[in-house]
Amino acid sequence: MPNNDEKKVLLKVTDLKQWFPLKKTKLFQKEQEYVRANDGITLNIYEGETVGLVGESGCGKSTFGRTLLQIYKQTEGKTMYYGRTLTDMAPLYVDETIKNISSGKKKIAELEAKAESLKAEYEKMEDSAEKFQKQAECENIQKKCNMEFLNLVQIIGGFYSLDDTKEAEQLLLEKFKVARVLSGLNEKNQMEGVDKKKEIAEKKVELEKAEKKLEELRSKYKNDEAFTKYESYRDNGVDLARLKTQEMRFLRKDMQMIFQDPYSSLNPRMTVGQIIGEGLLAHGIFKKNDEKMQAYVMEVMEKCGLAPYMIHRYPHQFSGGQRQRIGIARALALKPRFVVCDEAVSALDVSIQSQIVNLLKDLGSERQSCILIYLTWFECCKI
């Protein structure tokens, strides 16, 4: 089995925090208090890897899974996704970052100066509550400064070292403008079935030209130490925390979740076929009333331990374990690259548990999917 150095990182989580604000209990209470459900989680999740997350009830496992998929908007930290490239998606935050290079660098310099000032101040103080408060404030500013720096340098790379970045800004904006149009054409081609092959080919040529211009500009500074240093930070992954709602929705095909509670996660007004097929229609994999879709949905149902003839039944007509299988079938129907399974097999019979576990293993080997599973230690040992 290959070690982690040989495998590709699919998700890189750095200092992830998910805090929920508490209601203020006093009229003149100044300080906002929080429930720190997740506080400073850092880990790499690799392609084809099965990650088991074990912990007692209420420790924040479900919150972590939902935050990874941005169902909850994370409070702090970075969640980088490498299943698609920055060029493939061309998210709007890239343009915002490029247009604000100068102001971004200025903000970083101000934060660095503030952190240095606080550090010098608390180092002179004797041990006291005030000193530790100043130290904590300094550390928070340093973290914020580092995050601002990464947000900028991961996109522009070595151009961070230049005093005049106008040419680089223009070329980067040109590249991502073309990439965004190309991404839209590919989506229309898939979703609407419109033949856009000619336009796609033209935009690919434009994108190659834009990338060539950028490489030519980078080559001018290949012997510059500062440029090389900052260029090493350049990252073509997608920062999930900075995506807009619509952009994140586009990635739902890649990332799915099997919810812990089958009762509240299924729409009672939809049949099983409609529930499983909803994502397939939303992502343009099938057209409405397509006979092939019904055949595919029935195939997925059978794999998940549901009889195909149940396709027209509603959730209330099923037992708890069967409802859980509907949720599993809905998630796996899209053949995602990453699945968060929130105690997905805990409500199932032993025979069905092993069937679903084997199905998840097959998904991992066939699709290089990464599966994050929240289990009891006993269930974890079985996988």
Indicate residue ranges for each PLM-predicted region.
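Conserved ABC transporter NBD signature motif
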Residues: G77-D88, V178, L185, S219, ...
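Q-loop/switch helix immediately C-terminal to the Walker
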Residues: M270-I285
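Conserved ABC ATPase "signature" region
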Residues: E291-Y309
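Conserved ABC ATPase signature
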Residues: Y314-F318, Q322
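Hydrophobic anchor residue at the start of the ABC signature
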Residues: I328, I356
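Conserved catalytic motifs of ABC-family nucleotide-binding domains
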Residues: K335
